[in-house]
Design a protein with these regions (language model features):
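Alpha-helical transmembrane segments of multipass membrane proteins
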Residues: 16-17, 39, 65, 88
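Positively charged n-region of N-terminal signal peptides that target proteins for export
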Residues: 1-5
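Structured, soluble extracytoplasmic/luminal domains of envelope-associated proteins
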Residues: 76-124
């Protein structure tokens, strides 16, 4: 009985940590996306000073939370977001509006995807369980 109680306690702690990390991940990704969404309003006017500033702000927020995301995301996902930020900064510096818009859309889509993966939804748990059974079979 003692081992069952200890096991359930450990399981409860792990579940709580999983929920906390999931909520923090979604919060941090929204903080990173906010300046990028704000930069969209300056695209039509072509105000690259504001665009560069907002892009740098988003990149700083990503860098600030990089240690946290390194513990949750795969290296491929981290590299993809970092490369997208580098492309976005380069296009903003060169004032290449079409390329900036394409890179901006790609980065926003990637961040939204990462946010959706970590949101607490029943099918995120079910997909994980199904994948575990498929990999064993």
């Amino acid at each position: 009985m003692k081992y069952l109680t200890i096991g359930l306690g450990i399981l409860a702690v792990l579940l709580c940590l999983s929920l906390v990390f999931s909520l923090l991940s979604v919060r941090y990704l929204r903080e990173i996306e906010a300046p990028l969404r704000e930069a969209e309003s300056f695209l039509a006017a072509g105000d690259f000073d504001a665009i560069r500033s907002l892009t740098a702000d988003a990149r700083d927020r990503w860098d600030e939370h990089l240690g946290f995301f390194s513990s949750l995301l795969s290296h491929g996902e981290l590299d993809e977001v970092s490369n997208d930020f580098a492309s976005l900064s380069a296009y903003a510096a060169l004032e290449e509006l079409p390329d900036y818009c394409a890179a901006h859309a790609r980065l926003c889509t990637m961040l939204a995807h990462l946010r959706d993966i970590d949101q607490l939804r029943y099918y995120n748990f079910l997909c994980s369980i199904v994948n575990q059974f498929e990999n064993k079979g």
